[in-house]
A protein has these predicted regions:
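Early extracytoplasmic/lumenal segment of secretory-pathway proteins
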Residues: 32-124
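Short beta-strand->loop
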Residues: 64-67, 131-140, 150, 152-156, 166-168, 179-182, 257, ...
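Periplasmic-binding protein-like
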Residues: 188-197, 308-318
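Ligand-binding pocket segment of bilobal, Venus flytrap-like solute-binding proteins
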Residues: 207-282
Length: 318
């Protein structure tokens, strides 16, 4: 199965999960809408050529993203110097919250561009028509495998792996497989995120479905609950709240494949090795997208920001 096809299946499954846990995939909350992820939105493309001579100096646009996103230092200042467009960063609690707020304000958005909706929440965004189609000038530089939406409502901007992390010195025995999370050895040690509001949380849920299958994943989650799993609303709350990295008392957390390296690089004192590691079979590939929010008053400036965020210059800064 080609990677693009697999990602599209993940979108459908994610949307179905939202309907089954109470989050509809369309404005009227009908559970049969999962197959509408890639329906024609019947909206015209944003065309930069139509206003190519416009002077955008002094224009200000809002970029909404999740709270853990840290823009590369000086990146937006560079964009402003080049275009005259000022970028204001609005940070939501987590991906799920960001998407939910955008669904509620679809057509009259609180921001102009969204950065960070991923493949676990994308179906919900697409079926609720929160994006305006736009083909970025950088499209030829992007991987065709990640161009999931044939109508170009979103553009891939980043990808990585969601994985269960553990603090090496704080577990009785280093876990090597996802099945061990229900062992009494790790009772009260694991914290993850609510899949209704958090992209890492949804990614971990989908990883368990992939691992245990449709007949086994619910039993696994039942066992997790009996083993005192912690559930937080978002990544920040779990990683810097419950997890040892933030002063908490839980030694296992859903985070990212790159988290051990980050712990190593940003440690207050030099380390010889990272203090954390990942459980390899818990990982789930997350693809993040950027898109122009439908109803923006600044479609041209928003399109230029999408071009910038998907440019080689910005990508090398990430």
């Amino acid at each position: 199965m080609r990677y693009k096809s697999l990602l599209q299946i993940i979108l459908i499954v994610s949307c179905f999960l939202f309907t089954t846990i109470g989050f509809g995939c369309s404005n009227n909350d009908q559970s049969g809408k999962a197959n509408e992820c890639f329906d024609d939105p019947d909206l015209p493309l944003v065309e930069k050529s139509a206003s190519g001579d416009s002077d955008l100096s002094g224009v200000s646009i809002d970029l909404v993203t999740y709270d853990a996103f840290l823009p590369p230092e000086g990146a937006f200042e560079s964009f402003t110097a080049e275009t005259g467009i000022q970028v204001n960063l609005l940070q939501s609690a987590d991906t799920g919250t960001m998407v939910s707020q955008s669904v509620l304000t679809s057509g009259d958005p609180v921001a102009d561009v969204m950065f960070g909706i991923d493949n676990t929440f994308l179906c919900r965004g697409l079926t609720n028509d929160i994006f305006h189609p736009y083909i970025p000038s950088t499209i030829e530089q992007l991987s065709s495998e990640l161009l999931l939406d044939p109508y170009h409502r979103v553009t891939p901007v980043d990808y990585g792996d969601i994985c269960v992390n553990y603090w090496i010195d704080e577990v009785a025995e280093e876990p090597s497989t996802i099945t061990q999370l229900t062992s009494s050895k790790y009772e009260g040690q694991f914290v993850t995120q609510n899949p209704e509001t958090s992209a890492p949380g949804m990614g971990f849920l989908l990883a368990t479905i992939a691992y245990f299958g449709e007949d086994g994943w619910q039993d696994f989650w039942k066992d997790l609950r009996e083993n005192d799993v912690g559930i937080e609303s978002g990544w920040t709350e779990s990683y810097y709240g419950d997890f040892i990295a933030g002063g908490g008392d839980r030694a296992i957390v859903t985070s990212y494949l790159t988290s051990p390296i980050a712990e190593f690089i940003y440690a207050p004192e030099p380390l010889e090795t990272p203090p954390t590691a990942v459980i390899a079979d818990s990982c789930f590939r997350s693809v993040e997208f950027v898109g122009i929010l439908r109803g923006t008053d600044q479609p041209l400036a928003s399109a230029m920001l999408v071009d910038f965020l998907t440019s080689t210059y910005f990508q090398e800064l990430l």
